[in-house]
From Swiss-Prot:
It is a multi-pass membrane protein. The metalloprotease domain is constituted by the two C-terminal nuclear regions. This is CAAX prenyl protease 1 homolog. Residues 293-314 are annotated as: Disordered. Residues 1-18, 103-123, 192-195, 369-382 are lumenal. Signal peptide: none annotated. Residues 40-81, 145-170, 217-347, 406-475 are nuclear. InterPro entries: CAXX_Prtase_1, Peptidase_M48, Peptidase_M48_N. The gene is Zmpste24.
């Protein structure tokens, strides 16, 4: 009777109290679940000190131990940063941080001559202050991750000056995009009438497509140097492979990722008949950063930021041989182009937009509920931006967790399909060796807890991918 009496008493609380309590309870439930999973994986890092028999042919004990220690350090960092983030978020909610920041934004606006009727301007000030707070509180964690953990394990290639310039530039670019887009979205919601959710969804769709279109050409070059892949065998073979599957390739770039880190990557971008491929220089074993003269001849300007530490960066990269041979790079690209050929990119866009439409529709249903605002300290006003924050971040959090897990499962399926596509191109053997090299270069730990990997891994564990490719090689 005592337990049921407590449950009945809980329902006697006002609706806003129940909403607030449910949000906090769910947040901590997710945090404890994530911590439980992380501790399961951490136990694997601690106890698996020898190379498993099935890995002896592909990984030496030295690399295995390095990856184990690297992942242990990352696990420790993740625990403390996650705990801080959860406690900080709880304190912000308990002590009315959101309404306080909204009032502070209003005071700034009042001092500039803008009254309460200028809600959109107040919303932009709120966003600026909120993102500034987030950047400042996250800075120590980012510094520790970069200059302690990544540095310790040989991945960091940045100086402190380069890091800070980069952080400031990212913040400025983010504000230049976030503030005008947010202002237009809020305006559309306010004037859109009963069907504002349709107009808001269409607006965000257009914005996302524009950002995807301009990112690699206008935004990414603000932070990294992109150089056309030199004429040669690799470029020729990439073009031949692209043509064989009707991929409308227009350009191939190499990005100087080694200026920041030893981690490697490759991707493609662009719409319709204007596709481009980007390779990280850390992915290419047979590639060196062009000197200044070569850059000028190719028409590409070198970055000004961090030029003083270029030699230091190059020295670090040369001291650590990494990357893939041309045949392996082609296999990796065969996998990436498989995502395009199999329609994975389009499917992800469709899923994203269906989710976006559903969220805006539900937002339209819930935005008039005063108890949602009251739950977070807004008793006398219902600002649109605050409504977006409350509903999208807090009320939708259970749905977001379920959706995230489903997308993770789908992503793993897509990865297997892309590997199979590379196999059909005759790249199984080279992709097999490339995956081993990339895992070694990035110090990925090849042993994982099944529950942790099921919940978190957007890519299948290395052993599962290798087994599938091994069967393909035998075929």
């Amino acid at each position: 009777m005592g337990m049921w009496a407590s449950v009945d008493a809980m329902w006697d609380f006002p609706a806003e109290k129940r909403i607030f309590g449910a949000v906090l309870l769910f947040s901590w439930t997710v945090y404890l679940w994530e911590t439980f999973l992380a501790q399961r994986q951490r136990r694997i890092y601690k106890t698996t000190t020898r190379v498993p028999a099935e890995l002896e042919q592909i990984m030496d004990s030295d690399t295995f131990e390095k990856s184990r220690l690297y992942q242990l350090d990352k696990s420790t960092f993740s625990f403390w940063s996650g705990l801080y983030s959860e406690v900080e978020g709880t304190f912000i909610l308990l002590f009315g941080g959101i309404p306080y920041l909204w009032r502070l934004s209003g005071q700034f606006c009042s001092s500039a001559g803008f009254g309460p009727e200028y809600e959109i301007i107040q919303s932009l000030v709120f966003l600026l202050l909120a993102t500034l707070f987030s950047a400042l509180t996250g800075l120590p964690w980012s510094l520790y991750n970069t200059f302690v953990i990544e540095e310790k394990h040989g991945f960091n290639h940045q100086t402190l000056e380069f890091f800070m310039k980069d952080a400031i530039k990212k913040f400025i670019v983010t504000q230049c995009i976030l503030l005008p887009v947010s202002a237009l979205l809020l305006y559309i919601i306010k004037i859109g009438g009963d069907y504002f959710f349709i107009y808001a969804w269409l607006f965000t769709l257009v914005v996302s497509l524009v950002l995807v279109t301009i990112y690699a050409d206008y935004i990414a070059p603000l932070f990294d140097k992109f150089t056309p892949l030199p004429e040669g065998k690799l470029k020729q073979e990439i073009e031949v492979m692209a043509k064989s599957i009707d991929f409308p390739l227009t350009k191939v770039y190499v990005v100087e990722g080694s200026k920041r880190s030893s981690h490697s990557n490759a991707y493609f971008y662009g719409f319709f008949k204007n596709k481009r491929i980007v390779l990280f220089d850390t992915l290419l074993e047979e590639y060196s950063v062009p000197n200044k003269d070569n850059q000028e001849e190719s028409g590409m300007e070198a970055r000004n930021e961090g030029e003083g530490d270029s030699e230091e960066v190059k020295a670090k990269v040369k001291n650590k041989k990494q990357g893939c041979k041309n045949e392996e790079v082609l296999a990796v690209l065969g996998h990436e182009l498989g995502h395009w050929k199999l329609g994975h990119t389009v499917k992800n866009i469709i899923i994203s937009q269906m989710n976006s439409f559903l969220c805006f529709f539900l937002f339209a249903v819930l935005i008039g509920r005063r108890e949602l605002f009251a739950a977070f300290g807004f008793y006398d006003s219902q600002p649109t931006l605050i409504g977006l924050l409350i509903i999208f971040q807090f009320i939708f959090s259970p749905y977001n967790e379920v959706l995230s897990f489903c997308l993770t499962v789908l992503s793993r399926r897509f990865e297997f399909q892309a590997d199979a596509f590379a196999k059909k191109l005759g790249k199984a053997k080279d992709l097999y060796s490339a995956l081993i090299k990339l895992n070694k270069d990035n110090l990925g730990f090849p042993v994982s807890d099944w529950l942790f990997s099921t919940w978190h891994y957007s890519h299948p564990p290395l052993l599962e991918r290798l087994q599938a490719l091994k069967n393909a090689k035998q075929d």
